[in-house]
From Swiss-Prot:
Name this polypeptide is given: Cytochrome b
Binding residues for a ubiquinone: H201
Family annotation (CDD domains): cytochrome_b_C (cd00290), Cytochrome_b_N (cd00284)
Record field: transmembrane: 33-53, 77-98, 113-133, 178-198, 226-246, 288-308, 320-340, 347-367
Highest classification ranks of the organism: Eukaryota, Metazoa, Chordata, Craniata, Vertebrata
Organism: Lepus tolai
């Protein structure tokens, strides 16, 4: 009798995705982040569901409902901080996952890559709207500043912003709709993840060498199931360390002050995972230019496959590109730091230099390095 996992219509899909899937024998720990993102999404959906049972999306009670969750609900503090810090873990894994894709040339799987970019935008939108829900000072002013950016769109900008707000300022209507969107988007993300995996399984995984691995495949289970499990344990350990020892380490103290439209916080800044994009936005003195640069800082990922000039797929054997890649990483860390600093000298200049460098590396220097490396191959 054939095994049920190979014949049952539903189990067959699971089998082909997680058990009998042929995987390259040499994929490193950098390939763990996909499954870690799946774990993060599950943690976020579960903790979010339990938070939604106690949260009220009304301006008068939103802040106190979050306080109520932390004080009166059984393990409410744990659920709340798992959700808040789970978002940070989510973005750490996301950036590592994208970085891996750039380093090892995984972007040549165009469909998978493009769905991934859509996923990145969706997750960022979800995180932004989630940050508004506790209705603290930074929630309110973050929502005001970021939604206001849309007013830079010529002709329809102002109308668009008021349409999103549901009024003439961030208020009751805004909070309610943000809660609705924040609730529905993770399920859309889950659907997109399925499509992402569907496209990935059409081609199979890439591997560190960037060479086709058809001649050397191993079954996903038990080799990569146990490897993923180790990754899960490490992620959960890190998350629990964060939640149980310093849950507010990555948060903003201003968000423990209830939202007040009459009092602007001295430094309006988003959560740490958006700071690099925020720094790019602020480094351009023009509003529309800043918004375009902000969008392009992420959308540039879609252009990366077109700029692939190298004869090799992976950067594993390309030292010049490797150096540029790690300069890019350092540049992003610099932008993250600048995004959290006040708008004054010398931070303005550092931010502008880092922003120019960010686009230069991706658009000019990396393709040039690839061409030089191609030449070196012939020597």
């Amino acid at each position: 009798m054939t095994n049920i996992r190979k014949t049952h219509p539903l189990l067959k899909i699971v089998n082909h995705s997680l058990i009998d899937l042929p995987a390259p024998s040499n994929i490193s720990a950098w390939w763990n982040f996909g499954s870690l993102l799946g774990l993060c999404l599950m943690i976020q959906v579960l903790t979010g569901l339990f938070l939604a049972m106690h949260y009220t999306s009304d301006t008068a009670t939103a802040f106190s409902s979050v306080t109520h969750i932390c004080r009166d609900v059984n393990y409410g503090w744990l659920i709340r901080y798992l959700h808040a810090n789970g978002a940070s873990m989510f973005f750490i894994c996301l950036y590592m996952h994208v970085g891996r894709g750039i380093y090892y040339g995984s972007y040549t799987y165009l469909e998978t890559w493009n769905i991934g970019i859509i996923l990145l935008f969706t997750v960022m939108a979800t995180a932004f709207m989630g940050y508004v829900l506790p209705w603290g000072q930074m929630s309110f002013w973050g929502a005001t500043v970021i939604t206001n950016l849309l007013s830079a769109i010529p002709y329809i900008g102002t109308t668009l912003v008021e349409w999103i707000w549901g009024g003439f300022s961030v208020d009751k209507a805004t909070l309610t709709r943000f809660f609705a969107f924040h609730f529905i988007l993770p399920f859309i993300i889950a659907a997109l993840v399925m499509i992402h995996l569907l496209f990935l399984h059409e081609t199979g995984s890439n591997n560190p060498s960037g060479i086709p691995s058809d001649s050397d495949k191993i079954p996903f289970h038990p080799y990569y199931t146990i490897k993923d499990l180790l990754g899960f344990l490490m992620l959960i350990l890190l998350l629990m360390l964060l939640v149980l020892f310093s849950p507010d380490l990555l948060g903003d103290p201003d968000n423990y002050t209830p939202a007040n439209p009459l009092n602007t916080p001295p430094h309006i800044k988003p959560e740490w995972y958006f700071l690099f994009a925020y720094a790019i936005l602020r480094s351009i003195p023009n509003k529309l230019g800043g918004v375009l640069a902000l969008v392009m800082s992420i959308l540039i990922l879609a252009i990366i496959p077109l700029l692939h000039m190298s004869k090799q797929r992976s950067m594993m054997f390309r030292p010049i590109s490797q150096v540029l890649f790690w300069i890019l990483v350092a540049d992003l860390l610099t932008l993250t730091w600048i995004g959290g600093q006040p708008v004054e000298h010398p931070f303005i200049t550092i931010g502008q230099v880092a922003s120019i460098l960010y686009f230069s590396i991706i658009l000019i220097l990396m393709p040039l390095a690839s061409l030089i490396e191609n030449k070196i191959l012939k020597w």
